Amino acid sequence: MSDIMSNFSWLYGKPVATGKLKQLPEHFIVKEILGFEFTGSGEHLMVKIRKTGENTKYVANELAKFCGVKSKNVSWAGLKDRHAVTEQWLSVQVANSDELSFAKFEATHPGVEILEVTRHNKKLRPGDLQGNQFQVIATEVTDIEDVLARLEKVKLTGVPNYFGSQRFGHEGNNVNEARRWGRDNVRTRDNSKRSFYLSAARSWIFNHIVSQRITEGYFSQPVDGDILLDRNDRIVNENVTSEESIQKIQNGELSITAALAGDNQLPTTGTALTLEQPHLDAEPDLMALIRGNRMRHERRAIELHPENLTWSAEGDTLTLNFSLTSGSFATVIVRELLQEIEVERTYSSND
């Protein structure tokens, strides 16, 4: 199988080490961080689940059946990996839940545990997700000393804030389908599918821009015309190439950004514009899809700094612990450490 992420540059060079991820679901543990408290009352039943080897949408649909509501009445803050152990909240719009016995649900769904149940006055939405805590275990790791040296660099400098391979689908099929939609001017009322391909299109272009900045030596170095964001994701209007700005970038107070393409003109100028515009021009079909859906231009930081990063190595097994803000991908951290050896998996029909 081809690696779609091989299209993009590595910050620390292509790793020499190899290793396996997710040999077992418990080798990839994700715990959701919402960042707010529930009211304890309201029309929405909040159910905290721990799922193993199941995807979020399947569990949500099963929970809807169990609660006697339609699937559209169950929502979440974020979709979680299937081949993993993940903890997250689901909200169910149901008036009376007194007669529900979640022990029965668990008995018929061995891959799901119900950890906590409460109520809230609003349903969960994707914007509610603050971040995720991760524990990632890589096995059969070669050249462990090189991996440990790279981890020190990651802790100091971070990694490219790429969108991970899951955004692009198996062998890039989501990107290819997005191109077809743009080329054929496909129209649909399926908002979920439209959002899916739009995200793939914008992510693909963003990754290429970041990759070029790495290749040309502008990853941590601002250029004239760059757009900077502060820690609250607000655009900062100042001399981006000044010593003060460079120092703030190095301190993590400001972030260099790249384009999430839209139908409006890029706000970058000068050298920054020459780094970005060619990647939009190189993908006319993706841009046709983006413009046809009136997506507005946005900015995304090009650096990703994992929080509370720790690690340990025992033999050829590496354990990583860290937290990421919403929208960031754990796999792009591992990508800078080792080349992943594909693990053969057999899935049930619940996907």
From Swiss-Prot:
The active site is at residue 81. PANTHER family: TRNA PSEUDOURIDINE SYNTHASE D. Gene3D superfamilies: TruD, catalytic domain (3.30.2350.20), TruD, insertion domain (3.30.2340.10). Belongs to the pseudouridine synthase TruD family. GO terms for cellular component: cytosol. It comes from Aliivibrio fischeri (strain MJ11) (Vibrio fischeri). It catalyses: uridine(13) in tRNA = pseudouridine(13) in tRNA. This is tRNA pseudouridine synthase D. GO terms for biological process: tRNA pseudouridine synthesis. It comes from the Bacteria.
